[in-house]
């Protein structure tokens, strides 16, 4: 009583307290960062190593395995995967959430150093690492195009000047430059000319290497001067290499130009990048795991004018893709929805109270509670994201509830003739415990969420804390500011209502009277209502499930898979064909893509869609339409998926979800993977089924006759060196320039390597100086070979990726895969498990029931403590089954799967619908204790007295959530499952709990009386 009086009779202090809360909230709002979702990125580090010309199996055994053994000992590694392809190995380390990325990076460098002695000596450089997840979609893609500069020169500008500068920007984790390679001098040898001159490929390599050296020459001094010695020991361009003497034949000089074509070109000619049908160099920028995407993009954009000045004017630097516009639009949509929700909630209050003066009070309480929450969000290190803003939108209906309960009770005393200050004090005292019970029990719902681990826990923590803080501030405001404003603003007389609102008032009175009559009948037929309640509890609704709603971020990512033996020239043609099909789609704004490098048979595409207001289809509908057109393209497949704000795991795949096969027996894995993949491809629950196992590449298998080699004076080292020199794009020398280092690349001229007959033209110089054709001591035949070798941990692995067809959920796909694996009878040597997002989905589904039970148990404990009763909390919790059924029916009606967002809605319903029961039970207990009423009379009176605030609070929550259900702008697919569950649950529970709660109350009261009828014991001294 004194607590309430302190604020009611000191209006200045109360107002200033509220102003202070509001000012702190405004300051916090201005400093809050903006993001699509809470920070939930796993710390990921990518280790890269190269050995040009080495086969995938060689890279896996000699490079990947030693590194994996060393890296696997690092603390906090939750997953380690690797992929080895031609001349390249990439190892992805995913760490626990609480692992500091910088500390992990130091451990990774130490592990690389420890494994260095076990790696091949021929590696051109030490393994390197990057603090970025390669499976994440780039946050921005920049393109360089020019009509005057070559692709190699553009790549040089991009990798030498732009990429290092961008990498230094706060938040940038990796800048991947694609579309070509660094400039180089390429030496294309003519086999017949070499044979005619008696020159071996090793002779050419040695001559070039010896002719281009960079060594210190020292200095000369006399008594007064010092001269630095400088020589022309370096060759920089193709024109300088052309006249180089590499051999003497019969006294005549054999120059490089006599046996080779020397050109200024690039290190790897098997690379191509394009943007909208034009050759381009791509800079794909990824953020650090802990970085804020909006701040990082803004920093990059601010740097672009400076970057443009560092490159020639003839080079066009453009932004081909930017993830931030749709994120900003989505957040703006939520902010607008929040404002609409506040307006609708205040309108509900006005319609019920029919007094402008009374409506001002909750109209002040709502913004104070919401704005004050921003201060706590800033102190907790949160951001303005879709989930935190959704929490505030939902909180609109909650924070007004407390003010409504207090205001309505005070208004009832005023209408009865009590003086304003006395009514404020008496009314607040009567409902203070009710408001406290509602708020604490609502906050209690979120305690299990705060204790939840893993990605779901991280994802939901900001939502739970934001909503809890808003409810806490609302509780404070409703017990301080609201009664003070009621005491000083409201009048003792019954307010005059406007004529146009009298109809609503009469309707409300009629509704209350009708409810009273129906409630009397219900209380006389409690068994029938009990059967209805039990039937609701027993109702089982089967609904599809998924991890996270499929978002439309306006960006698509596509992976190209062609025949594994395809040539680079053919693959480049496929890329161009696919890009044309996509570019012609009316919903597409921009297309970029690249292919080549160590994976000639694959490529990547990034597609930017037009803004939502310029297209009528969702991203998934566009994918479905394009899938039909792309299927007509022979010889290759393009798998499209919508880029999501959440992607789990470090695997790069061509689809959204992954199923990984592991085995310690590589042969068994290669035998069963095609069988499993083909089986999964037939399932209607899956789409775009593909695999990262590429073991059907074309290989030319050479078998040496060692006896013949020994007789001819040739060793294996010389033969292998021949093949590497001829076909390995061997980097044989380095050209040093002020800004970068470039390579001299030697190979047989591509004109002479169009078919396997090129091997017949190869020869080795033996120890007697004679040219011995390769065919003298080797036989060859075509065979299949792996284009990549994949590991997870230290086991051989193959990942099958898939998307979901329209109308199918992740739970459908998961169940179908489990059935298929059982039907196939896969041996125990091959183990299958979901990976990435699908794995988190499995873990989340297993914990959902426990989470809901924990929330209900927590609420029961809190209510039991508040009411000092085991029974009354059960009465209050009896409202939950109808709400849960209503939520699931609503999801079924809107064809929405049960996702993590829908789970939040269920948790919220646990907190929302029990408010009705709390108000009824609270007043019924008070009437029984002090009004000498029977339980039936008490609960009947409580239901009638609390009918208006129950309707007000329920409609406030309903209208607070309604704008999110009806919104269709950016990010709506993320928000709607939450609101659908809340609206469906509220409608169903409102229809039932007004009748079932009194029945349950009377049932437990009779039960209590039955067990309390015990003979009294006498105590004797």
Curated annotation (Swiss-Prot):
Belongs to the resistance-nodulation-cell division (RND) (TC 2.A.6) family. MdtC subfamily. It holds the Pfam family ACR_tran. Keywords: Cell inner membrane, Cell membrane, Membrane, Transmembrane, Transmembrane helix, Transport. One of its GO terms (molecular function) is xenobiotic transmembrane transporter activity. The chain crosses the membrane at residues 7-29, 336-353, 360-379, 389-411, 431-453, 468-490, 849-871, 891-913, 944-966, 981-1003. It is a multi-pass membrane protein. This is Multidrug resistance protein MdtC. Residues 1-6, 354-359, 412-430, 491-848, 914-943, 1004-1021 are cytoplasmic. It is found in: Cell inner membrane. Residues 30-335, 380-388, 454-467, 872-890, 967-980 are periplasmic. Its main location: membrane. GO terms for cellular component: plasma membrane. The gene is mdtC. Part of a tripartite efflux system composed of MdtA, MdtB and MdtC. MdtC forms a heteromultimer with MdtB. It comes from the Bacteria.
């Amino acid at each position: 009583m004194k607590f309430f009086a302190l604020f009611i009779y000191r209006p200045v202090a109360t107002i200033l307290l509220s102003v202070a809360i509001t000012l702190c909230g405004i300051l916090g709002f201005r400093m809050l960062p903006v993001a699509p979702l809470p920070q939930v990125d796993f710390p990921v580090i990518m280790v890269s190593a190269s050995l040009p010309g080495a086969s995938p199996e060689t890279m896996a055994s000699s490079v990947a395995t030693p590194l994996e053994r060393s890296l696997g000992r690092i603390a906090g590694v939750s997953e380690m995967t690797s992929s080895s392809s031609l001349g390249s190995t990439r190892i992805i380390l995913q760490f626990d959430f609480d692992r500091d990325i910088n500390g992990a990076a130091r451990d990774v460098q130490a592990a690389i150093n420890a494994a260095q002695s076990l790696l091949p000596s021929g590696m051109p450089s030490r393994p390197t690492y990057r603090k970025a997840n390669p499976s994440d979609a780039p946050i921005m893609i920049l393109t360089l195009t020019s009509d005057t500069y070559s692709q190699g020169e553009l790549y040089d500008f991009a990798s030498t000047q732009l990429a290092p500068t961008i990498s230094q920007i706060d938040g940038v984790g990796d800048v991947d430059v694609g579309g070509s390679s660094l400039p180089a001098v390429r030496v294309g040898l003519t086999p017949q000319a070499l044979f005619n001159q008696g020159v071996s490929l090793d002779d050419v390599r040695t001559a070039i290497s010896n002719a281009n050296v960079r060594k210190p020459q020292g200095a000369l001094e006399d008594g007064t001067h010092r001269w630095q010695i400088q020589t022309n020991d370096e060759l920089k361009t193709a024109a300088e290499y052309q006249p180089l003497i590499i051999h003497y034949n019969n006294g005549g000089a054999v120059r490089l130009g006599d046996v080779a074509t020397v050109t200024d070109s690039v290190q790897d000619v098997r690379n191509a990048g394009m943007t909208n049908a034009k050759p381009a160099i791509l800079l794909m920028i990824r953020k650090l795991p802990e970085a804020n995407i909006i701040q990082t993009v803004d920093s990059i954009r601010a740097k672009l004018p400076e970057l443009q000045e560092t490159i020639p004017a003839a080079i066009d630097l453009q932004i081909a893709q930017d993830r931030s516009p749709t994120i900003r639009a989505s957040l703006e949509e939520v902010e607008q929805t929040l404002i609409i929700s506040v307006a609708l909630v205040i309108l509900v209050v006005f319609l019920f109270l029919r007094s402008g003066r009374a409506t001002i009070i909750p109209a002040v309480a709502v913004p104070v509670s919401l704005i004050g929450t921003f201060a706590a969000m800033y102190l907790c290190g949160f951001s303005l994201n879709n989930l935190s803003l959704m929490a505030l939108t939902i909180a609109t209906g909650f924070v007004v509830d407390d003010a409504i309960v207090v205001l309505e009770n005070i208004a009832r005393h005023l209408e009865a003739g009590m003086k304003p200050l006395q009514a404020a004090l008496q009314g607040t005292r009567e409902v203070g415990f009710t408001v406290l019970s509602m708020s604490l029990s609502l906050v209690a719902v979120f305690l299990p969420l705060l204790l939840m681990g893993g990605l779901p826990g991280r994802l939901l923590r900001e939502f739970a804390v934001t909503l809890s803080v808003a409810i806490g501030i609302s509780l404070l405001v409703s017990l301080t500011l609201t009664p003070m404003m009621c005491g000083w603003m409201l009048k003792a007389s019954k307010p005059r209502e406007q004529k146009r609102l009298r109809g609503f008032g009469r309707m409300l009175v009629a509704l209350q009277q009708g409810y009273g009559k129906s409630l009397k009948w219900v209380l006389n037929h409690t068994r029938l209502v009990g059967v209805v309640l039990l039937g609701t509890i027993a109702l089982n609704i089967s609904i599809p499930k998924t991890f996270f709603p499929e978002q439309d971020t306006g960006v698509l990512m596509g992976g190209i898979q062609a025949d594994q033996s395809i040539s680079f020239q053919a693959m480049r043609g496929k890329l161009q064909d696919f890009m044309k099909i996509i570019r012609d789609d009316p919903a597409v704004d921009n297309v970029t893509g690249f292919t080549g490098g160590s994976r000639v048979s694959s490529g990547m595409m990034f597609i930017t869609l037009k803004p939502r207001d310029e297209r009528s289809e969702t991203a998934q509908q566009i994918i479905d339409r394009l899938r039909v057109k792309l299927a007509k393209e022979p010889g290759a497949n393009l798998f499209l998926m919508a880029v999501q704000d959440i992607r789990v795991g470090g695997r790069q795949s061509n689809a959204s979800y992954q199923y990984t096969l592991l085995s310690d027996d590589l042969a068994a894995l290669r035998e069963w993977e095609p069988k499993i993949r083909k089986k999964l491809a037939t399932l209607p629950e899956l789409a775009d089924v593909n695999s990262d196992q590429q073991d059907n590449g074309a290989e030319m298998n050479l078998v040496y006759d060692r006896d013949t080699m020994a007789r001819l004076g040739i060793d294996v080292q010389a033969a292998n060196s021949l093949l590497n020199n001829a076909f390995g794009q061997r980097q044989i020398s380095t050209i040093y320039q002020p800004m970068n280092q470039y390579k001299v690349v030697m190979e047989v001229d591509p004109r002479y390597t169009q078919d396997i007959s090129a091997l017949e033209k190869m020869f080795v110089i033996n120890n007697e100086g004679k040219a011995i054709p390769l065919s003298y001591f080797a036989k060859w035949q075509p065979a299949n070979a792996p284009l990549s070798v994949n590991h997870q941990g230290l086991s051989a692995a193959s990942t099958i990726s898939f998307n979901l067809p329209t109308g199918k959920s992740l739970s459908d796909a998961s169940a179908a895969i489990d059935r298929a694996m059982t039907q196939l009878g896969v041996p125990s040597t091959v183990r299958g498990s979901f990976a990435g997002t699908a794995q988190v989905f499995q873990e989340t589904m297993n914990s959902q029931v426990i989470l809901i039970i924990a929330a209900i148990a927590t609420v029961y404990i809190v209510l039991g403590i508040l009411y000092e009763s085991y029974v009354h909390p059960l009465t209050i919790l009896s409202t939950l089954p109808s709400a849960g059924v209503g939520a699931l029916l609503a999801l079924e009606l809107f064809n929405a799967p049960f996702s993590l967002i829908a789970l939040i809605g269920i948790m919220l319903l646990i907190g929302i619908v029990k408010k009705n029961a709390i108000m009824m039970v609270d007043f019924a207990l008070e009437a029984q204790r002090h009004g000498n009423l029977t339980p039936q009379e008490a609960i009947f009176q409580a239901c009638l007295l609390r009918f208006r605030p129950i309707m007000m609070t329920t409609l406030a929550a309903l209208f607070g959530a309604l704008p999110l259900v009806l919104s269709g702008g950016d990010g709506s697919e993320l928000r709607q499952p939450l609101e659908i569950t809340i609206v469906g649950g509220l409608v169903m529970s409102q229809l039932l709990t007004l009748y079932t709660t009194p029945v349950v109350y009377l049932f437990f009261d009779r039960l209590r009386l039955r067990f309390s009828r015990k003979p009294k014991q006498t105590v004797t001294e």
